[in-house]
């Protein structure tokens, strides 16, 4: 009988400290960290004094805003959301610690365990090992505690010049770029002939030039819709699987000619046709003239468009078409119902060319989605890079201050595209430069908190 009781106690002790997260505190052999909360921490920041000297000041960080995740399966404790830059992780305090047993921390010097006092400031500049000792004096469990802090400012942007003096871009003009999966496409004109240059996002310094047929293709009209490219040639709709060889689309209904392709969504292909905005939901085979809410002008002189996910519902997308009519800025928006239940027309948003944050007057506009906002660029009259503009109100207000732009000179044509890793590529003809940059926080990875 005594032997059976001894075996049962050992089994209970082992159950209390196994690696399954569903373990409950049912025996004296239980040894789990149930909760752990960071306390008030110090954050040291730099500033310049009036005399120009660098000085440091300290602010408080509420540690509880950065919850600690407990991975019972792999015996790890960490904060998914890193502490802000400058937080002093050498002096970490805890405002709460709940465990089924005594908690000790391994010394960085001797390697021995000492009782952890949550009121003490502890050095977590490197991951530390804590051990929970059960009340039976036998069972224990170790955890690696990793207090993470950002090493870079979230809203800062770092640019890298990945290429310079590329001969393939020496004489290309009217650049227009797209990214498809991991391939960069830069369409343009070389003399009067359309070309496309391609590179992999992993090696944006290596580009391959391809001549395009037919020779009348409008390089600036190219859009990606579904798994194909669409563009215009002599105002007629063309399609391609590789961006190099193009064939006419056999349209059975719609306009006789197109002015420009201005957007592509999950289902909708959008175009300007004279004084109309038209759309197709069958890959350009048939077209419908869309309703306009006013007689305001369309952007027939300089234009760009974009379709992106709606913030209202996953069943909707938002379409934006903007540009210039003469020297006047123009903005139109439309909601697209992916279910096909409702059909909405285009709404004109009057713009004031003299208002702060107005649409910049540029040529060869490029429009992309970035950081849940609209990213706009274009060329100045001489073809040089026109800068980066960001709009968080769907094209009504444009500001440059959010995006740091590299110093670019010598460009005779420039365009922008964005890849799936949130990198912005600035591609410059003439100088043959390619720049790549990203807002730091858009490169941060979110760790899974569902453990198996």
What residues fall within each predicted segment?
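C-terminal motif of bacterial Sec signal peptides marking the signal peptidase cleavage site
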Residues: 12-16
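Predominantly extracytoplasmic/ectodomain segments of secreted and cell-surface proteins
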Residues: 18-173
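Beta-propeller fold detector
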Residues: 155-165, 204-214, 247-254, 287-296, ...
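Beta-strand-rich domains and repeat architectures in extracellular enzymes and scaffolds
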Residues: 163-191
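Repeated scaffold domains used in trafficking and secretory/extracellular systems
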Residues: 167-178, 212-227, 251-267, 293-315, ...
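Entry beta-strands of beta-propeller and related beta-repeat scaffolds
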Residues: 181-187, 227-231, 266-271, 314-322, ...
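Conserved Ser/Thr-centered positions that define the repeating blades of beta-propeller domains
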Residues: 197-202, 239-241, 280-281, 333-340, ...
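Blade-level signature of beta-propeller repeat domains, shared across WD40, Kelch, NHL, RCC1
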Residues: 409-452
